[in-house]
Amino acid sequence: MKILGIDPGSRITGYGIVTKEGNRLIHVDNGAIFTDSAKDFPSRLKRIYGSLSEIIETYRPDAVAVENIFFSNNVQSALKLGQARGAAIVAGVNAGLDVFEYTALQVKQAVVGNGKAAKQQVQQMIKVLLNLPEIAQEDASDALAVAICHAHSVTIKRLTSASVQEIKSKRYK
């Protein structure tokens, strides 16, 4: 399964692509989409959408995982972040992909095993899990973490579903 993780932002949107083969996680690519703050906001959203659409077309992921907004003290920033998330989600949906959302707490829990882990701990664990030569750019690293979170979530859902089916089959025999 190939997963595109996205860390949306109105100035910088990180992306990370991870393949899960059995129990192995394999790094495919990562990077950041930078928008020009001198341009109007709709043009910046168009850049995010267009760049992610190109990435989806190039790498053909099976699923998209996006970091969810937790909170923001600045209403204007939260609205812009929400719109950037919307552009990312639409890029995935428009390509016919399922889009999954995870909170920062869920991502940290999946990657480090501690929902309150420091950013440096998460970055270091990503480097180890994906056998990267160095820590990825901050936004790209966050996106890789979201992709890893989804990879782990799919495994857990599969195991849970199999266990439920096994219990049901025994109960009705």
Curated annotation (Swiss-Prot):
Its cofactor is Mg(2+). The active site is at D7, E67, D139. Mg(2+) 1 binds at D7, D139. InterPro entries: RNaseH-like_sf, RNaseH_sf, X-over_junc_endoDNase_Mg_BS, X-over_junc_endoDNase_RuvC. Binds 2 Mg(2+) ion per subunit. Mg(2+) 2 binds at E67. It is found in: Cytoplasm. It is an enzyme of class 3 (hydrolase). One of its GO terms (cellular component) is cytoplasm. One of its GO terms (biological process) is DNA repair. Its main location: cytoplasm. One of its GO terms (molecular function) is DNA binding. Keywords: Cytoplasm, DNA damage, DNA recombination, DNA repair, DNA-binding, Endonuclease, Hydrolase, Magnesium, Metal-binding, Nuclease. Its EC number is 3.1.21.10. Transmembrane segments: none annotated. Pfam families: RuvC. Homodimer which binds Holliday junction (HJ) DNA. The HJ becomes 2-fold symmetrical on binding to RuvC with unstacked arms; it has a different conformation from HJ DNA in complex with RuvA. In the full resolvosome a probable DNA-RuvA(4)-RuvB(12)-RuvC(2) complex forms which resolves the HJ. The RuvA-RuvB-RuvC complex processes Holliday junction (HJ) DNA during genetic recombination and DNA repair. Endonuclease that resolves HJ intermediates. Cleaves cruciform DNA by making single-stranded nicks across the HJ at symmetrical positions within the homologous arms, yielding a 5'-phosphate and a 3'-hydroxyl group; requires a central core of homology in the junction. The consensus cleavage sequence is 5'-(A/T)TT(C/G)-3'. Cleavage occurs on the 3'-side of the TT dinucleotide at the point of strand exchange. Belongs to the RuvC family. This is Crossover junction endodeoxyribonuclease RuvC. The gene is ruvC.
